[in-house]
Amino acid sequence: MAELDIQISIEDIGWPGEETLLVFCERVLGAAAIYLRDNEKQPFPKMPPEVSLVFTDDASIQDINAEWRGKDKPTNVLSFPAFPVQRGKVPGPMLGDIIIARETVEREAQELEKSFDDHLTHLLVHGFLHLLGYDHMNNAEAETMEGLETRILAQLGLSDPYEGQDLKMEP
């Protein structure tokens, strides 16, 4: 497994305990880092880079989404890179923060007829890619990012989360 220094903060009592989340996130993000290193030639720093994960609720993520993106509504995941990074370049020692809202993950998982864990896995991978400079602001970026997500999730035994859907460009 690729080494990452994962820091976890739990702000909502509905999330599993810290140890459970840490093991889960180490497996998911470790697999993502290995896939990117081995298949996409993504370099990583010599020291394990730090990723901060905040597991929160809809109200908190709505406040953050309104402040930083001008969207006064909850969202599933937000990512904040610690430093500007270009895809394929060595990131800094701190990758940044990924914030995930439990109620939105639960609601979307139910709507998508997926398990909570499978949807959370997808959102962790999605947020991790944002920390490494990937985005989905246009068709080309969305195609690249969604393709990576699909291949990483396949390594984890999960199906294509975008199958039968249009590209998810950010408005």
From Swiss-Prot:
Name the record gives this protein: Endoribonuclease YbeY
UniProt-listed InterPro entries: MetalPrtase_cat_dom_sf_prd (IPR023091), YbeY (IPR002036), YbeY_CS (IPR020549)
Pfam families (UniProt xref): YbeY (PF02130)
Enzyme class: hydrolase
Function of the protein: Single strand-specific metallo-endoribonuclease involved in late-stage 70S ribosome quality control and in maturation of the 3' terminus of the 16S rRNA.
Cofactor binding note: Binds 1 zinc ion.
EC number: 3.1.-.-
Binding site for Zn(2+): 126, 130, 136
An example molecular function term from Gene Ontology annotations: RNA endonuclease activity
Annotated localization: Cytoplasm
Superkingdom field: Bacteria
Cellular component GO terms held in the UniProt record: cytoplasm
Swiss-Prot/TrEMBL cofactor(s): Zn(2+)
GO biological process: rRNA processing
Organism of derivation: Rhizobium etli (strain ATCC 51251 / DSM 11541 / JCM 21823 / NBRC 15573 / CFN 42)
Family, per entry: Belongs to the endoribonuclease YbeY family.
Key words, A-Z: Cytoplasm, Endonuclease, Hydrolase, Metal-binding, Nuclease, Ribosome biogenesis, rRNA processing, Zinc
PROSITE patterns named in the record: UPF0054
